[in-house]
């Protein structure tokens, strides 16, 4: 009997954390057989700030700034998760006007995140012009955030039991022009990316996931819908007012990088259509924008000191859970509340689970495919290294 024994010599390379495509905070140990990747060992934690620990034994409004810094591309979606979880515990309902305004800013944030994800992925593939083009629309969206709350990055727009302030009267014209402009840009993006033969040949067949990864590794968001999973928290969990809107739902079956690019473009378009419906309905609904309005407080130094030191919104000890459809996937929050303070807080961030599967989806591919896939799965390390 003849036995054939083949000895493979593996080469080990270190990718990152200094590499720009690794965001400066990701280290990958790559094992190669020739030019092909055999195994990837991801080393994370270079940006670790202990967010969950820092939020312990603080009031919920003191935890909001930490959530701003989790996924610093989708700030309002992070704030929305914490506010929603606390409101579930209080079992309170917001006014229709406040709910519409929340959805408007959340869906604009989803488009804001998608623009950066797609443009940076295309930059990793070697194209510079789409990055500069997308930043024009991102600057318009930042101007929208600035008009809403006076900030461009760390917004602090969603306060507990409401939003920061009502929109100003002259804001309506700018908002309508912004929605029309973004919808026009989405048409151009479809022609540039989906209808482009070069992008199709480069991304089709790159980094497959399968149904085993979907079930046992908890894929969510765009990655799960690219495998044919008909699931979207906005559509099936019915949180906030998403059941009142008319929008389409899309999923693919191959599960490669091109499907994920197509679904991100589709999600951005649907977010803008939801914003359009919010604009035509929400601005004609009257109501309070916050159940506890600071504007009607007596503006004296004693009142300011009282608001600063007091726990203004307390509830009975308990546990609350909330899950939202974040631009990265499903974000879940478990909040334990006791004596007016947040005693325990646990986050389930989708991009942390997605980056753990780099080894699965890149075996047999080349080094330059790793850079393309890192941009394609949309990872922000503020939430990965929380």
Curated annotation (Swiss-Prot):
Biological processes annotated in GO: mitochondrial electron transport, NADH to ubiquinone
InterPro entries named in the record: NADH_Q_OxRdtase_suD (IPR001135), NADH_UbQ_OxRdtase_49kDa_CS (IPR014029), NDH1_su_D/H (IPR022885), NiFe-Hase_large (IPR029014)
EC number(s) recorded for this UniProt protein: 7.1.1.2
GO cellular component labels: mitochondrion
Enzyme class: translocase
Subcellular location: Mitochondrion
Record-level Gene Ontology MF annotations: NAD binding; NADH dehydrogenase (ubiquinone) activity; quinone binding
Reactions catalysed according to its record: a ubiquinone + NADH + 5 H(+)(in) = a ubiquinol + NAD(+) + 4 H(+)(out)
Taxonomic superkingdom: Eukaryota
Keywords: Electron transport, Mitochondrion, NAD, Oxidoreductase, Respiratory chain, Translocase, Transport, Ubiquinone
Matches recorded under PANTHER family: NADH DEHYDROGENASE [UBIQUINONE] IRON-SULFUR PROTEIN 2, MITOCHONDRIAL, NADH-UBIQUINONE OXIDOREDUCTASE 49 KDA SUBUNIT
Function: Core subunit of the mitochondrial membrane respiratory chain NADH dehydrogenase (Complex I) that is believed to belong to the minimal assembly required for catalysis. Complex I functions in the transfer of electrons from NADH to the respiratory chain. The immediate electron acceptor for the enzyme is believed to be ubiquinone. Component of the iron-sulfur (IP) fragment of the enzyme. Component of the iron-sulfur (IP) fragment of the enzyme.
Family: Belongs to the complex I 49 kDa subunit family.
Name the UniProt record assigns to this protein: NADH-ubiquinone oxidoreductase 49 kDa subunit homolog
Naturally occurring in which organism (per UniProt): Trypanosoma brucei brucei
């Amino acid at each position: 009997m003849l036995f054939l024994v083949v000895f493979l010599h593996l080469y080990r390379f270190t990718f990152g954390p200094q590499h720009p495509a690794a965001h400066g905070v990701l280290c990958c140990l790559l094992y190669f057989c020739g030019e092909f990747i055999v195994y990837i060992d991801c080393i994370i934690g270079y940006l670790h700030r202990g967010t969950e620990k820092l939020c312990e034994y603080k009031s919920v409004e003191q935890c909001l700034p930490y959530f701003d810094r989790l996924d610093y591309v989708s700030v309002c979606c992070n704030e929305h998760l914490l506010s929603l979880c606390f409101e579930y515990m209080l079992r309170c309902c917001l006014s229709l006007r406040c709910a519409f305004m929340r959805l408007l800013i959340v869906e604009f944030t989803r488009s804001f995140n998608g623009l950066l994800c797609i443009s940076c992925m295309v930059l990793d593939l070697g194209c510079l012009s789409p990055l500069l083009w997308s930043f024009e629309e991102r600057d318009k969206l930042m101007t929208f955030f600035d008009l809403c709350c006076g900030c461009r990055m760390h917004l602090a727009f969603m306060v507990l039991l409401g939003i920061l302030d009502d929109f100003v009267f002259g804001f309506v014209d700018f908002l309508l022009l912004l929605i029309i402009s973004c919808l026009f840009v989405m048409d151009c993006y479809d022609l540039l990316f989906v209808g482009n033969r070069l992008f199709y040949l480069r991304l089709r067949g790159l980094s497959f996931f399968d149904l085993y990864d979907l079930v046992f590794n908890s894929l969510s968001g765009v990655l799960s819908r690219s495998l044919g999973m008909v699931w979207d928290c906005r559509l099936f969990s019915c949180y906030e007012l998403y059941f009142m809107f008319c929008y389409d739902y899309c999923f693919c079956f191959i599960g490669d990088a091109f499907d994920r690019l197509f679904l991100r473009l589709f999600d951005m378009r649907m977010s803008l259509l939801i914003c359009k419906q919010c604009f035509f309905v929400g601005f004609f609904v009257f109501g309070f924008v916050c159940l506890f309005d600071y504007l009607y407080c007596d503006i004296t130094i004693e009142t300011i000191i009282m608001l600063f030191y007091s726990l203004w919104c307390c509830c009975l000890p308990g546990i609350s859970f909330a899950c939202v459809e974040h631009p990265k996937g499903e974000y879940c929050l478990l909040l334990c509340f006791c004596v007016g303070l947040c005693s325990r807080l646990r986050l389930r961030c989708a991009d942390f689970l997605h980056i753990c599967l780099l080894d699965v989806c890149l075996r047999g591919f080349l080094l330059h495919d790793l850079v393309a896939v890192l941009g394609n799965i949309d990872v922000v390390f503020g939430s990965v290294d929380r």
